[in-house]
Regions:
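C-terminal structural segments of small proteins and small subunits
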Residues: 65, 74-86
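Proteins with a high burden of low-complexity, intrinsically disordered sequence enriched in S/T/G/P/A and R
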Residues: 2-3, 73, 87-89
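Short S/T/G/P-rich N-terminal loop/turn motif that feeds into the first structured element of a domain
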Residues: 1-52, 59-69, 93-98
Length: 98
């Protein structure tokens, strides 16, 4: 079973998120995760509330939660919130057989 984390956010210039973007990949990989997709979503139906979406895959719920709760990632969350002025929407979807 695989677990997917969806991160949705409003547009913030990448220059404001330099520290976060330079370091987040290592925190994902250290928990067995990988980035599946990142960018501006294309609306097929409904209203798009976010301008950027990231989709991450982890091999287990424990790895996904371990990544999110890790001190290394939480330090990056603090820098991201400081740069953006608000938190983002992060959701875990589990039990995907691939």
């Amino acid at each position: 079973m695989h677990y997917v984390v969806f991160v949705r956010t409003d547009d913030t210039p990448d220059s404001d998120l330099g520290h976060y973007l330079a370091n987040v990949g290592a925190t994902i990989e250290s928990h067995g995760g990988r980035l599946l997709a990142f960018g501006a979503p294309t609306r097929l139906e409904g209203a798009v509330e976010y301008t950027k979406t990231a989709i991450l895959e982890f091999p287990s719920e424990a790895e996904a939660r371990g990544w999110y709760d890790s001190p290394g990632y939480q330090e990056l969350v603090a820098s991201r919130v400081a740069a953006m002025g608000k938190p983002v929407d992060v959701n875990l979807l589990g039990g995907l057989a691939v």
